[in-house]
Structures are given as C-alpha cells and as structure tokens.
Amino acid sequence: MYATPIGYADTRFETAADAPRQGVETPYAANVQVYESFRGGLVGLEPDDRVVVVWWADDADRDVLAVRDGDRGVFTTRSPARPNPVCITPCELLAVDAADGTLAIRGVDMAHGSPVLDLKPALD
C-alpha cells in the first residue's frame, strides 16, 4: 500500500490529547496547507462547501484493539487509536486560497502537523 500526504493540518492543537474528540464539538477554525504539487486539485472548491478531511493520526497508538477497559472493539469507535489511524473529519470550508494552498476550515479535531491524505466533498 502506498499513500502520499497532500498537505498537513495547521491547527491550535499541539497534540492529539489537546484536540477535541470530534470536530463537531468545537467551533475552532484552522487551516489545511496543501502542498504545491496538489493545488490543482483545489479548483472548484468554494467557501461554504462542506468537505471531508481525510487525515492520518500519526501520533496515535496503533496497538489498540479494544477500548473502555475492553468492553468494545476499536472498530466500533471513531477513535484514532487503531491499527491504521486513518481519520475522517467533516468540516465547513470558510475560505480557499488555491494559489498558496490554504483552506480555512471549521470543525477540526486533528493535531497540528497531522498529514492530510485527501479532501472529499461531504454528502448531506
């Protein structure tokens, strides 16, 4: 398997422990910085769109299979602590600057520097 980050999260949360459990639980705005080689993919994104940020929880514990003292398996949760910490966060798109690759978003739950793997339109 091979995946290349398209950018990274620029947030106020220095660690995963600082971030909210779910993006919908926070009003905080943040940025996604898209690397130059991927900025052509931003064409057509508009403020007020809803996007799903697909990101990698690079500081997550990858040895976890059960949560809450073992009463539930990790695959029944949205926890980033899991064998493959791929995370999805629906966000409100506040602004797009395709020239410098900056997306301003609201509803973030990722730590600063988290690799962003993809952006997808959110479905209602």
From Swiss-Prot:
It holds the Pfam family TrmO_N. Disulfide bonds: none annotated. Keywords: S-adenosyl-L-methionine. The keyword Isomerase does not apply. The keyword S-adenosyl-L-methionine applies. It comes from the Archaea. PROSITE patterns: TSAA_1, TSAA_2. InterPro entries: TrmO-like_N, UPF0066_cons_site, YaeB-like, YaeB-like_sf, YaeB_N_sf. S-adenosyl-L-methionine binds at residues 20-22, 58-59, 78, 111-114. Residues 3-124 form the TsaA-like domain. Belongs to the tRNA methyltransferase O family. This is Probable S-adenosyl-L-methionine-binding protein VNG_1115H. It comes from Halobacterium salinarum (strain ATCC 700922 / JCM 11081 / NRC-1).
